[in-house]
UniProtKB/Swiss-Prot annotation:
InterPro entries: Domain_X, Maturase_MatK, Maturase_MatK_N. One of its GO terms (molecular function) is RNA binding. It comes from Abies holophylla. GO terms for cellular component: chloroplast. This is Maturase K. The gene is matK. Belongs to the intron maturase 2 family. MatK subfamily. Keywords: Chloroplast, mRNA processing, Plastid, RNA-binding, tRNA processing.
C-alpha cells in the first residue's frame, strides 16, 4: 500500500489508469485481508468485517478466476432466472463483487483525498468532522447567523459515475461500477430511480459512496467559501477605536492608494465557519439578514449545477444564533451576546475611547434537553423524573453507569455556561430517575435506595469536576476558575441522546 501511495504521489496520471487490472489481482484483496486482521484500520473494525456473512476473500478470489474464464453464468446484473436458488447465488456473487469493487476504488480515492486535503489548509473533507461546539467560544462570537443544511440521500447513479469519471480516466473500471449502481437501484428494496444512500446503514459500499459524494461537494464548496468570506489581511480588532467605524473606513479609503482598497475593504467581509457531521452541515456567518438569504438561495443552486441534483429549499434552514437554538449530535447550542463597554484611556490623557464589544455567554437550553430526556422515558414532558422500566433487567452497576455516562456528557459540554441552574436541574432529573429505576427493580422505595447509595448515586459532581480540570491550581485559582467559562474540549464519545435527537430531526424532515 505504501508503494501505491508513493506511485500516486509521483505520477498523478498513474492513479487514473491502473484500476481495471486491479480487479483481477488476488494480492490486493490479500493485502486488505491482512490489514484488517492486524487491526490497523481506524475506519473499519474486524467485528464489522466478520458481521457480514456474505463476504469472503476466498469467494472473491474464485469469482475473479471465473471472470477471467469469461463464464457468463456468474453475471450478477441480470434478474431473468426465476429459480430462487439461482437468485440467492447471484445475490451472493453480487455482494462479494460489490465489496471487492469498493476495496479497489478506495485505493486511488484515499490517495487523492490525502494530498488534496493537504492543499486545502487542513480541511478534513474525506471524513465527517466530529465537532460539538467546544471551539465556539473562540470562533463564533464573530458570527450571528447559522445555516443548517441537510445533504440529500437520494442520488441518481449516473451522477455518482460522473463524479468518479472526473478523476478516473480508466473507462473499463467505470463499467462495473455503473452496472453495480444500476443493479442496486433496481433492487427490490429500492423502487425509486435514484439510489438512497443512508450513511447510518453499516455497509461499506454505501459509506464509500457517501464519503465520495460529500468529498466532491466540499472540495468545491469549501474553497469557494474560504475565498469569498475569509479576511485576507488585518483583523477587525486591529483598530482599537471602533466608534463610527464605517465612517472612518470610508475616510481611509479616500486617502489610500487604489491597490490597498481591497485589503482594507476585506475588514468588512463577513467571517464564515463550516462544520459537518454525517448528513448535516452547519455554516456560521457574520453578516446581515440579506446575506443569509442570498446564501440560502445559492446553496441549492450550487448543488443543482455542480451535481445535477435538485435540493429542496427546506433543507437549508437559517436562524439567528442569539434568538434560536442550534443542535448537533444531541447537543444544543444557545448563546447570548451581551454588549460590553470597555473604556480606554491614553497615557497622556488626551482622549478616551469607548470600545463596545459582544460578550459570548453560552446558555443551557433546558427545554430541548428535557424534551430529549422525555423521549428517552427518563422524565415526562414537564420535567418530572420517572423510572426507566426498560433498564430494570440490568444490573445495578450497569444502571448507574448508563445514567452516569449521560450526566458526564451533558456536564462536560455545558460546563462552559456561567448560569448553572439548568445543569443542577438536569442532574436532579437524572439522579431521581436513576433512584426510581433502582427502586422499581428491587421493589423498594426511593428513600431506601438513596440511603444505601448516598453520594455514590452519581460519581461526578461540580466540585470534583473542577478539581479534575485544575489539579495543580491553588485554592484561589480554583475559586477564580468557578467564575470563568471553561469548555471541556475532549469529549471522546457521542452523546447517548443523539439517537433520539436524530429521530426528532427525521420526523421534522
Amino acid at each position: 500500500m505504501d508503494e501505491f501511495h508513493r506511485y500516486g504521489k509521483e505520477d498523478s496520471s498513474w492513479q487514473q489508469c491502473f484500476l481495471y487490472p486491479l480487479f483481477f489481482q488476488e494480492d490486493l484483496y490479500a493485502i486488505y485481508h491482512d490489514h484488517y486482521l492486524d487491526g490497523s484500520s481506524s475506519s473499519e473494525s474486524m467485528e464489522h468485517l466478520s458481521s457480514n456473512d456474505q463476504f469472503s476473500f476466498l469467494t472473491v478470489k474464485r469469482l475473479i478466476g471465473q471472470i477471467r474464464q469469461q463464464n457468463n453464468s456468474i453475471v450478477f446484473f441480470l434478474n431473468c432466472d426465476p429459480n430462487p436458488l439461482v437468485d440467492r447465488n447471484k445475490s451472493f456473487y453480487y455482494e462479494s463483487v460489490l465489496e471487492g469493487l469498493t476495496l479497489v476504488l478506495e485505493v486511488p480515492f484515499s490517495i487523492r483525498s490525502k494530498y488534496s486535503v493537504e492543499g486545502m489548509n487542513e480541511w478534513k473533507s474525506f471524513r465527517s468532522i466530529h465537532s460539538i461546539f467546544p471551539f465556539l467560544e473562540d470562533k463564533f462570537p464573530h458570527s450571528n447567523y447559522i445555516l443548517d443544511t441537510r445533504i440529500p440521500y437520494s442520488i441518481h447513479p449516473e451522477i455518482l459515475v460522473r463524479t468518479f469519471r472526473r478523476w478516473i480516466r480508466d473507462a473499463p473500471s467505470l463499467h462495473p461500477l455503473r452496472s453495480v449502481l444500476y443493479k442496486y437501484r433496481n433492487s427490490p428494496d429500492n423502487f425509486q430511480k435514484s439510489i438512497i444512500i443512508d450513511p447510518r446503514v453499516n455497509t461499506r459500499f454505501l459509506l464509500f459512496l457517501w464519503n465520495h459524494y460529500v468529498y466532491g461537494c466540499e472540495s468545491i464548496l469549501v474553497p469557494l467559501l474560504k475565498r469569498s468570506f475569509h479576511p485576507r489581511s488585518l483583523s477587525h480588532g486591529s483598530f482599537p477605536d471602533q466608534t463610527h467605524f464605517d465612517r472612518k473606513i470610508k475616510h481611509i479609503i479616500r486617502n489610500y492608494r487604489r491597490n490597498s482598497l481591497k485589503s482594507i475593504w476585506s475588514l468588512k467581509d463577513p467571517r464564515i465557519h463550516y462544520v459537518r457531521y454525517a448528513e448535516r452541515s452547519i455554516i456560521a456567518i457574520k453578516g446581515t439578514h440579506l446575506l443569509v438569504k442570498k446564501c440560502r438561495y445559492h446553496l441549492p443552486i450550487f448543488r443543482q449545477f455542480y451535481f445535477h441534483l435538485w435540493s429542496e429549499p427546506y433543507r437549508v434552514c437559517s436562524h439567528q444564533l442569539s434568538k434560536n437554538c442550534s443542535s448537533s449530535l444531541g447537543y444544543f447550542l444557545r448563546v447570548r451576546m451581551k454588549p460590553l463597554l470597555v473604556r480606554t484611556k491614553m497615557l497622556d490623557e488626551l482622549f478616551i475611547t469607548d470600545l463596545i464589544t459582544d460578550e459570548f455567554d453560552p446558555i443551557v437550553p433546558i427545554v430541548p434537553i428535557i424534551g430529549l430526556l422525555a423521549r428517552e422515558k427518563l422524565c415526562d414532558i414537564s420535567g418530572r423524573p420517572i423510572s426507566k422500566l426498560y433498564w430494570t433487567s440490568l444490573t445495578d452497576d450497569d444502571i448507574l453507569d448508563r445514567f452516569d455516562r449521560i450526566w458526564k456528557n451533558i456536564f462536560h459540554y455545558y460546563s462552559g455556561s456561567l448560569d448553572r441552574d439548568g445543569l443542577y436541574r438536569i442532574k436532579y432529573i437524572l439522579s431521581l430517575s436513576c433512584a426510581k429505576t433502582l427502586a422499581c427493580k428491587h421493589k423498594s422505595t426511593i428513600r431506601v435506595v438513596r440511603k444505601e447509595l448516598g453520594p455514590e448515586l452519581f460519581k461526578k459532581d461540580f466540585s470534583k469536576e473542577r478539581e479534575f480540570y485544575f489539579p495543580a491550581f491553588s485554592s484561589k485559582a480554583a475559586a477564580r476558575s468557578q467564575r470563568e467559562r471553561i469548555w471541556h474540549s475532549d469529549i471522546p464519545q457521542i452523546n447517548p441522546l443523539a439517537n433520539s435527537w436524530q429521530k426528532i430531526q427525521d420526523l421534522k424532515s
